[in-house]
Amino acid sequence: MSFSSLSWAANVFSLINIEQMIRVHSYESLGTYDGPGIRLVVFLQGCNFRCLYCANPDTIDAKGESKETAPEDILKMAVSQKPFFGKKGGITFSGGEPTFQAKALIPLFRMLKEEGIHICVDTNGGIWNEDVKELFSLADLVLLDVKEFN
């Protein structure tokens, strides 16, 4: 197989798997604010709300400053930090809005469960579909951040 054939195959593979990539804005290691215990916090890119008082306004735009990240890369990071989690810690997905990328997160949540890592989702609750239902069924804790009601 020639180099150009390999490049073409890699491009096709990346297009096929684009839905499986996760748009990550940033990480916080040893976080203590976003869920119980010590946590790896993954701030995701993209949100369905445009709150004027947003704590993370740079995560709102779905095409903002983010890195397309393979689920396996996040898994490796979580597993490497697992000794610090203790009995109460784990990983928290925040944002942005995690349910904005529910379909891409489902395989990662399954892998995290296999590793025995506690999963928390910090959500605005504004997206509800079958993917979100499945995502929540895999999570150990959902933190619902109510933005407004009447």
Placement of each model-derived feature along the sequence:
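Conserved Radical SAM active-site core
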Residues: 18-20, 38, 56-138
